[in-house]
Swiss-Prot record:
Protein name as it appears in the record: Transmembrane protein 106C
Location in the cell: Endoplasmic reticulum membrane; Membrane
Self-association and partners: Interacts with TMEM106B.
Pfam families: TMEM106, TMEM106_N
UniProt xrefs under InterPro entries: TMEM106, TMEM106_C, TMEM106_N
GO cellular component: endoplasmic reticulum membrane
Length: 260
């Protein structure tokens, strides 16, 4: 505002059948208001605002009838340090976005074969079967800043291209952020039938170490932040079928499929 002239104009809807005397009276009132001077309320020589009568606000019944005019040079329309505040807000938004992107960006989840062992061996003489309880261990390394879930695990044991055992599990484990976790599971494999000679080989007392080679294919499904990935491992293992609780060493480990 300032030492300037202002007007509070009354806008009324005029119809063609309005009384000419009323229109003339309204025009005279508008001209009288337009010539009414005022200065800032905070000024030293200020006078009472004609529209609000010093109350600091316009009465509700006159909100839609009065218009306040503010000079473009009024300092209240130009807040101090506006550019600094806007720049600081932009920088803070960029920093927050960068941190969120860094911590939520998917990092690698590695799945490795940590070896197997035969925890139990039993023989079915009637059917010439060798039953192996093969306990396998997977090492899962989570490099993310949030936990990941092992939602599904499937493993299959083969001997001479014949499937002799399988294992399936859901909701296996939850891997904490930035950590390694071992997942153990046991597959029951029955070797016999067309391979009945394995029974006679594994029960032959003249042989001290009864080694056979089995092939394992393991698929692990991992889920995190609405994303699901799968890793598949294939490996050949040398196992002793002649005694229980025998630790074995892998002959060949061939990872297959995408590592997360």
């Amino acid at each position: 505002m300032g030492s300037q002239h202002s007007s509070a104009l009354t806008f009324c809807q005029r119809k063609k059948d309005d009384n000419p005397e009323d229109l003339l009276a309204e025009r005279d009132q508008e001209e009288a208001i337009a010539q009414f001077p005022y200065v800032e309320f905070t000024g030293r020589n200020s006078i009472t605002c004609h529209t609000c009568q010093g109350a600091g606000y316009i009465p509700e019944e006159q909100v839609n009838k009065l218009v306040a005019l503010i000079p473009h040079s009024d300092q209240r329309l130009r807040p101090q340090r506006t550019k600094q505040y806007v720049l600081l807000s932009v920088l803070l938004c960029l920093l927050a976005s960068g941190l969120v992107f860094f911590f939520l960006f998917p990092h690698s989840v590695l799945v490795d074969d940590n070896g197997i062992r035969v925890s139990n061996v039993t023989f079915n003489k009637q059917d010439s079967l060798v039953v192996l309880d093969v306990t396998a261990t997977l090492k899962i390394r989570n490099s993310n800043f949030y936990p990941v879930a092992v939602t599904n695990l499937f493993s299959q044991v083969q001997y001479m291209k014949a499937v002799v055992g399988s294992y399936t599990a859901a909701n296996v484990s939850l891997i904490p952020p930035r950590s390694e976790h071992l997942v153990n599971f046991t597959v029951k494999a029955e070797v016999g039938g067309p391979s009945s000679y394995v029974y006679f080989y594994c029960t032959l007392p003249a042989i001290l170490v009864h080694n056979i080679v089995i092939f394992m294919r393991t698929s692990v499904q991992i889920s995190y932040i609405g994303h699901t990935s799968q890793s598949t491992l294939e490996a050949q293992h040398n196992v002793d079928c002649g005694e229980n609780s025998t630790a074995v060493q892998s002959l060949l480990l061939v990872p297959w499929g995408p590592h997360l």
